[in-house]
Amino acid sequence: MTEYLLLLVGTVLINNFVLVKFLGLCPFMGVSGKLETAIGMGLATTFVMTLASACSYLMEHYILIPLNIAYLRTLAFILVIAVVVQFTEMVIRKSSPTLYRLLGIFLPLITTNCAVLGVALLSINEHHNFIQSIIYGFGAATGFSLVLILFAAMRERLVAADVPTPFRGVSIAMITAGLMSLAFMGFTGLIKI
């Protein structure tokens, strides 16, 4: 049980996919303009990453390895992720049309989010079992969502702030992201793995 908790805390805070591994930067910068959109994208990405991590484990251990076609891993995982994203898109369209409109083009772009593929590949490369794969996917997605929501809240406040003209827009956003990364570095000594 402790091992699972350490894996979860490690992926959320210490080895954050956005701030440490630099995966998922496109939606991090693109969807963080409004807090409401960031929350929706975070929830959708959390669902997709967790489910894709579990499905990728099953694909790897029950199809790719037994058939001796592990060299098709990346292609197979992209296919799994595309199916999971389409399923998520259908669920969001039916359950929350407003969120579906807010997310717009970013929902199908979860398919190309390198963080989702990164979770699947890294989970397999680190030889996680099925439960660890799910926890790793959920932890990575929770960390992604946490950073995305915090960053969106900061960007909303920066719009009203008196920022010097050369630093407005993307410049102050990148500085803020760098400061967030430094803040998350403080968690590095929290767990010794």
From Swiss-Prot:
EC number: 7.-.-.-
GO biological process, one term: electron transport chain
One GO term describing the cellular component: plasma membrane
Coiled-coil annotated spans: none
Enzyme class, UniProt record, top EC level: translocase
InterPro entries registered for this protein in UniProt: Ion_transpt_RnfA/RsxA, NqrDE/RnfAE, NqrDE/RnfAE_oxidrdctase
Alphabetic keyword roster: Cell inner membrane, Cell membrane, Electron transport, Membrane, Translocase, Transmembrane, Transmembrane helix, Transport
Compartments reported by the entry: Cell inner membrane
Residue intervals passing through the bilayer: 5-25, 39-59, 63-83, 102-122, 134-154, 171-191
Membrane topology reported for the UniProt record: Multi-pass membrane protein
Pfam families per the UniProt record, alphabetical: Rnf-Nqr
Role of this protein: Part of a membrane-bound complex that couples electron transfer with translocation of ions across the membrane.
Quaternary assembly: The complex is composed of six subunits: RnfA, RnfB, RnfC, RnfD, RnfE and RnfG.
Family: Belongs to the NqrDE/RnfAE family.
Name listed for the protein in its UniProt record: Ion-translocating oxidoreductase complex subunit A
